[in-house]
Structure formats: structure tokens, C-alpha cells
Amino acid sequence: MTTPLRTLLAAAFAMAIIAPTVQAAAPMVKSQAPGYYRLMVGDVEVTPINDGTVDLPMDQLLKQNADTTRATLGKNFLKVPTETSDNAFLINTGSKLVLVDTGAGTLFGPTLGKLVANLKAAGYQPDQVDEIYITHMHPDHVGGLASEGKAVFANAVVRAGKADADFWLSQANLDKAPADKKGSFQGAMASLNPYVKAGKFKAIEKDGELVPGITALAAPGHTPGHTIYVVQSRGQKLVLVGDLIHVAAVQMDNPQVTIGFDSDEKAASAARRKQFDAAAKEGELVGGAHLQFPGLGHLVTQGKGYKWVPVNYTQVR
């Protein structure tokens, strides 16, 4: 065999070995992991559940100079529109399974509505939920309650602040609402209606304990009956603040900045300051509906605002 022929055969043999490796390149999956996280608050198991994300024009929504908003977001490696988490929180007290907020369901498009799938991935079923506590009746918090006119959580009692129920479930308010606001009323009514008809909706009329270890506190401003929920066990505390904050990159440094979704901007700002001052002073764990998933962390007073310290990823012990 001549030398050139030996060289050609060797090259062909080498290519035969390499070729399968090249052809076996795996396709990209391009999907996110199931959106749930787990931690213990004393003896209570808390599972943040992500309903998905939605892109929002925060430079237009936040009540400050748009250029300032864009610059601040940029410094935090964010852009506009800003991808914003929509989080709910599942609380297992050992005797009750409680869900705080339900995500958007089908009311906000295909990037949301993942709560039930993620709840199941977390090891639970909708029929196991005993109680649902709504922070407020905006569509991205109540939309997951119903699907095609039927209750998604067949065995659950739903609770929300009375002022929110009186406002959002009022036909008179729907009738006189501006055209661009009617959808919020209609979404709330459609979402709550199966539970109202079944006698499974109960308004929260005053601050107090709803089940052992979970307390409701009125924090109006974002909506008339916006409510926060405090989980306590063995000296540990988690405060679920709902929509007291939307954009940590902006509103932690400047807590006076409000958002266009607030029904009463002055009251919303005051509620944020009150609860955040307390959380920073006491070192309380905070959970937010629109803080980047899992939406959990601590507040440290810094200048005229706060520093957000996200929770450290930990094993459940």
C-alpha cells in the first residue's frame, strides 16, 4: 500500500470516529424549571409558586421621570419592558393548606397562568387547598381562581378584604368605570363568582388571625382593601406584602415612587413605608408578589430607603 493511500485511509477512519460525535449534538430545550421553592418558617412549610412572568413598561408605569427609571433599571441589568414575576405562596400549617393569591389564570396572556402546573410539580393538588387568601382583586392575583366559569379549587374557602370585595364586585362600580378599567372589574367578578355562588367567599372585615399562625392586616392604598398576611411559627415570621412593591430595583432605594396601578398613591406609599420600616427593624422575612421569584428576602435600612437581600438558597431541613 502506497503512503498516500495509507494517509487517505487513516483520515477516513478518523472522520468515521468523529462524525457520530458531531451528529449527536443535543437540541436546546429552551424551557424553564418548574417554578416553586420551599422553606420552613418555624414548623410551617411555605412554598412560593410562580405563575409566570409578564413584560411591563415600567418606565411608563412608575410615577417618576421615565429616563430616571430606565437608567436605574439599566444599572440593575434590567430593561424595559421589564420582565416581572407573578408569585403566589402556598402555606402548609400542618392542619390547613392555605394559598395566598392565585396568579392570573387566562386573564393576562400565555406567559402567565402556570400556577396549577407548578403547584402540582411542588407535590400538591388544587383539591387539597383548604383556604385561599387574596391580597387584592386585581386580575393577576385572582385570575387563577376560576377556569371556564368553574372553581379551580373546589374545596377551598376564599377570603379577601371587605373593602376590596365591596369595590371590585360591585356592578354599579363596573357600570361607571372608564372603558380601560372595566376589564379589572369583570375579571374579579368572573374569578370570584363560582365561590360567591357556592357560599365559599368570606370577606375579611377586620385585622386578626384567620387560622392558627396566619394573620390578616389591612394595608390599603394599592387597592381599597389591599391586605397583607403574616405567617408566624416558633418565633419566626414571614410577611406576605402583596403589591406593596412592584420593582425592587427602583422602589427599594426610592420607596416614595408609586405605580399607575395604585388606586390611592399617597396611601400606597404610606403603607409600603410602614410595613417596610417594621420589617427592616425586626429583621422579618418578606415575600412579594412581584419581586423576582421566589420573591423572598430581608430588608435593611439604607439611606432614605432599603437594601433588598434575597434569601439564600437552602435545603429544607
Task: Please annotate each region the language model reported.
Residues 109, 230, 234-317:
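Cap/insert and terminal regions of metallo-dependent hydrolase folds
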Residues 51-52, 102-105, 137, 163-164, ...:
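Active-site metal-binding loops of divalent metal-dependent hydrolases
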Residues 24-30:
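Cleaved targeting-peptide boundary
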Residues 132-142, 219-226, 287-294:
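Histidine-centered catalytic micro-motifs
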Residues 32-122, 228-245:
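Conserved beta-strand hairpin/beta-sheet module of binuclear metal-dependent hydrolase folds
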Residues 26, 113, 120-124, 128, ...:
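Metallo-beta-lactamase
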Residues 85-88, 94, 109-159:
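Active-site metal-binding motif and surrounding structural segment of the metallo-beta-lactamase
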Residues 1-23:
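Gram-negative bacterial Sec-dependent N-terminal signal peptides
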